Amino acid sequence: MQVRTLATITTDTTVDTRVPTQNYQRHPEMVLQVGITGTITVQILGSLDGTTWVEMLAASAASQLSAAALVPHVRIVTTGTSGGTAVVKVGTGQGPRA
């Protein structure tokens, strides 16, 4: 599993992270750790295949998780005013793995 930690992002900020295709194939699971000062929306953008999934593992101040389309391109958008940390897991295959 590849773990990527993104810098803390603040309210009303959008962070895009693109996973290189070769890395995505080598590491079918990726964990994004995001420090947030607002609620969080995570979108999978584009088109890769029909088996991409996204899972909110933990979120002390996250109220929304939105998966749209399928590709190793993750957009993290924060809104609102509450603080906390969110851990989001994305990958390909049959679904989240333990």
State where each predicted segment sits.
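Noncatalytic modules at the cell exterior or secretory-pathway interfaces
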Residues: 26-32, 68-87
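Conserved Ser/Thr-centered positions that define the repeating blades of beta-propeller domains
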Residues: 45-47
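A short, compositionally biased N-terminal segment around positions ~18-40 that is enriched
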Residues: 20-38
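C-terminal interaction-tip segments
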Residues: 1-26, 80-98
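Short proline/glycine-enriched turn/loop motifs at strand-loop junctions of beta-rich domains
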Residues: 36-41, 82-83
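Exposed aromatic-hydrophobic patches
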Residues: 17-22, 62-69
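Surface-exposed loop/edge segments in extracytoplasmic proteins
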Residues: 1-6, 50-58
